[in-house]
Amino acid sequence: MRTCLVGSEMCIRDSFDEAARLGVGFCLGYAELTPDGHRYNTYVLVDKTGAIVGKYRKVHIPGHADDEPHRPFQHLERRYFEESPDGFEVVNAFGGIVGMAICNDRRWPETYRVLGLQGVELVLIGYNTPMHYAPDPDQNPLQSFHNNLVMASGAYQNGTWVVGVAKGGIEEGVESLSHSQIIAPSGQVVAQATVSGDVLISARCDLDLCRHYKETLFNFDVYRRPEAYRIITEQKGVAPPSG
């Protein structure tokens, strides 16, 4: 494949050309180096003409910055990437309101709520999750459960479709979760990968279904109480009561 540089972004030109030929869109994740030297874990949204219509930089950076010899493998994302200063934004694309998130972002409810407050109807998430979690291996058997839990909850509580696309299989001895999913605004999984190799899953995503939840149980304008949630943005870590 030929590669090219578009500003500070490296793209695989043939993928863009093929998207335009087929009339389909896609997301592409890459390591971004900005002209002023910042490094981000970045995602672009490409429409059916092959044009970039959205860009997102990862907010929640997991892992560690220094080598930890006791680990069977290193998770050095915090060494190589900075936290995004941009937050979560949506774009109008594919006839709806689309938001993006990357990997660890999917575990945080704030991700979906910030997008939900902008009317998101389709959240696109790419993730690469090892089956082994070194800080607490007792969570290993729960990886699939937790993966579904966070994306289904985010979909339901914000009345949006969620498409989670996973990297599966074994690379350099590390097994990844896989389990790509398409989740409806009801929180129901309507399509899921059941193998760890390359596989295509699909579903018809009726964006009008989002209104069933956005205009009823999760009508934010009627039921949300921002004044009761101030601690969420005013405080970062846990602060137990004294005494």
Residue positions per predicted region:
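Single conserved hydrophobic/aromatic residue that forms the stacking wall/gate
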Residues: 1-7, 11-12
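Active-site beta-strand/loop signature of hydrolases that rely on acidic residues for catalysis
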Residues: 8, 19, 26-27, 105, ...
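Short, basic/aromatic recognition patches
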Residues: 16, 22-35, 152, 158, ...
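Short, basic and Ser/Thr-rich N-terminal targeting/leader segments
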Residues: 20-26, 37-40, 84, 102, ...
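RNA-binding accessory domains that recognize and position tRNA/RNA substrates
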Residues: 26, 92-94, 118, 230, ...
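Short beta-strand scaffold segments in enzyme catalytic cores
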Residues: 28-30, 42-45, 89, 180-182, ...
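Active-site catalytic loop in hydrolytic enzyme cores
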Residues: 33-135, 139-149, 215-219
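C-terminal beta-strand edge segments of enzyme domains
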Residues: 153-154, 160-243
